[in-house]
Amino acid sequence: MIISMWALYAIIAAVLWGVDYALTERALQTIRFPMLLSIELFFGFLTMLGIAIFSGSYKTDLAGLFSSNRAIALVVAIVVAFNIANMFIVLSIGDKNATLSGLIEISYPLFIALFSWLFFKENNLSAGAILGGIFVLTGVSLIYFSNK
């Protein structure tokens, strides 16, 4: 069986998020979250800017972005949500630990489904996905209440 690229990308992302969260827990013993996030985001900016310039996509993307008020609004909302979410997960890791914070955060796909429906009227849920979501919520509740 050959794995689809989208699934491989998601697995790689999950592994790297695991590395990031474990390292974040240790880094927060030395530095505070604003500095850690500033460093992460600064180098992320440089990396992505380099990729955009090298691939040549920046010209097309900037033209597309600034030709649409909707695109600008979406990007602003994404930047706000991304930065606030990063701040809260790092605060959670610092307050408890990377393992429990990550296990609670794993519920975010439920919110993807909710907001995709609320914002765009998209419904990508199957019976299996709904059942899986119920298991996720049950697991999150079990983790939270057994680790207060």
Predicted segments, located by residue:
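Structural signature of transmembrane alpha-helices in multi-pass secondary transporters
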Residues: 13, 78, 105-108
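C-terminal transmembrane-helix exit sites in multi-pass transporters
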Residues: 110-130
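Juxtamembrane helix-start motifs in multi-pass secondary transporters
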Residues: 36-37, 101
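Membrane-interface interhelical linkers
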Residues: 1-12, 29-34, 42-76, 83-95, ...
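Hydrophobic/small/kink-forming positions within alpha-helical transmembrane segments
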Residues: 18, 22, 49, 79-84, ...
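Small-residue-mediated transmembrane helix hinge/kink sites in multi-pass secondary transporters
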Residues: 25, 90, 116-117
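N-terminal signal-anchor/start-transfer transmembrane helix
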Residues: 12-27
